């Protein structure tokens, strides 16, 4: 038996007739978001950088190669009056494109990446080898250029698997929520260790040498080394000088649908980030000795 809300197909409370216990379906349960710093609150390294990799917002890399001018990654404010702002998001991670005077090279790329420890997936409650068990990825994204963007989830353990996806067409300068519900697959493997088990990437641009026309979006497939995002994507953003791309509200949860974002306090989020990178209180001195990455593969 179950109790459902009016016009809802999901049970709010499920009752076990055998022992009389019940289970509540909580959309705001603590710890449901497997992403660390998905609201882009923490930026221990600084608020702006042209560094390749981790340079600004904690736990989110901005990786690039082949650029004529390096892109800038920056923690920025979410503007009041926007939908993400009304949902409690105050920060975003913004990529500002450099001036790519030689055009879109076939091996060029610029993309966001977040890594999750294998043990956090293997012990998440997701029955990842079952096609009837799901995780849902959701995030807010805004581009200064109207186009769609590619992304993927990629596993690390066993035979690496790739799940390519497309954001759908975005209107320029408009925040859009992207949601992807992803079934498990018998080929997935996540070891119980602290290595990077799952990579999540959102591509600003990937060249054609790094794509595969045979890739199928929205399904798991064996990862072909060097293939980043499945199918080709448009180069409009990349060939537009100073084009921008922003993300916030990134959430990955064990669910067959997206639920409300798990907002954590600044202190909670900082503590989670410090497992991977710690800035000493005297970090303003900019001494390399004040920075100590923790030994995990993620």
Give the positions of each predicted feature.
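Extracellular and organelle-lumenal recognition/adhesion modules and their flexible linkers in secreted
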Residues: 1-9, 13-298
């Amino acid at each position: 038996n179950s109790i459902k809300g009016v016009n809802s197909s999901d049970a709010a409370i499920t009752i076990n007739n055998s022992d009389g216990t019940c289970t509540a379906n909580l959309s705001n349960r603590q710890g449901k978001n497997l992403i660390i710093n998905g609201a882009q609150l923490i930026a221990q390294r600084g608020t702006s950088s042209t560094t390749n990799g981790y340079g600004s917002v904690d736990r989110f890399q901005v990786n690039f190669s082949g650029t004529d001018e390096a892109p800038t990654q920056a923690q920025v404010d979410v503007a009041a009056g926007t939908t993400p702002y009304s949902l409690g998001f105050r920060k975003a991670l913004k990529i500002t494109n450099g001036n790519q005077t030689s055009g879109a090279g076939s091996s060029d790329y610029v993309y966001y990446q977040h890594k999750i420890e294998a043990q956090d997936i293997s012990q998440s409650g997701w029955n990842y080898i079952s096609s009837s068990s799901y995780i849902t990825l959701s995030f807010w994204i805004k581009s200064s250029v109207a186009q769609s963007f590619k992304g993927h989830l990629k596993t690390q353990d066993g035979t690496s698997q790739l799940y390519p996806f497309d954001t759908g067409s975005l209107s320029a300068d408009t925040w859009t929520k992207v949601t992807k519900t992803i079934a498990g697959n018998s080929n997935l493997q996540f070891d119980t260790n602290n290595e990077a088990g799952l990579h999540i990437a959102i591509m600003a641009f990937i060249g054609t040498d790094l794509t595969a026309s045979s890739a199928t979006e929205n399904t798991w497939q064996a990862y072909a080394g060097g293939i980043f995002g499945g199918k080709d994507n448009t180069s409009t953003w990349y060939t537009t000088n100073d084009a921008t791309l922003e993300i916030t509200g990134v959430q990955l949860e064990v669910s067959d649908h997206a639920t409300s974002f798990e907002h954590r306090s600044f202190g909670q989020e900082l503590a989670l980030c410090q497992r991977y990178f710690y800035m000493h209180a005297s970090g303003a001195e900019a001494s390399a000795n004040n920075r100590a990455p923790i030994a995990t593969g993620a």
